[in-house]
A protein has these predicted regions:
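Cleavable N-terminal signal peptides
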Residues: 11-12, 23
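Extracytoplasmic electron-transfer domains, predominantly the class I c-type cytochrome c fold
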Residues: 63-112
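Bacterial N-terminal signal peptides that target proteins for export
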Residues: 1-10
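Short, non-ligating residues that shape and space the ligands of small metal-coordination modules
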Residues: 53-54, 73
């Protein structure tokens, strides 16, 4: 019985440590990145994963956390201003305002960490 209780306590301690480590690792977003996250949630999350772990709802839409592996996210600025037309097949064409672009880029950079 003591061994069983010890195992339970060890499990609880390990899970508590993991939760604490995860909470400490999450840094708060800057106001600009928060606005970018809000934009992404409203306009992009129907197809793309906009977090660090989830798969994209639409399989052909790359998760935002992997964009920096393809090219520097700063390179998206011009495409976002002129309108992205070469995304995945279901992606609508759109153009963003300069402040929206800066906000979205700031958010995308947080996913690189």
């Amino acid at each position: 019985m003591i061994r069983y209780t010890s195992l339970i306590m060890l499990g609880l301690l390990a899970s508590s440590f993991y939760c604490l480590q995860t909470a400490l690792a999450q840094t708060p977003l800057s106001p600009r990145a928060e606005r970018g996250q809000t934009f992404a949630r409203a306009n992009c999350a129907h197809c793309h994963s906009i977090d660090k772990v989830s798969p994209s709802p639409l399989a052909i839409a790359p998760p935002f956390r992997t964009l920096h592996q393809r090219y520097p996210v700063e390179m998206l600025e011009e495409a976002l201003a002129e309108g992205i037309v070469t995304g995945h097949a279901n992606m609508p064409e759109f153009r963003l305002e300069p402040d929206q672009i800066g906000n979205l880029i700031a958010f995308l950079k947080t996913l690189e960490r």
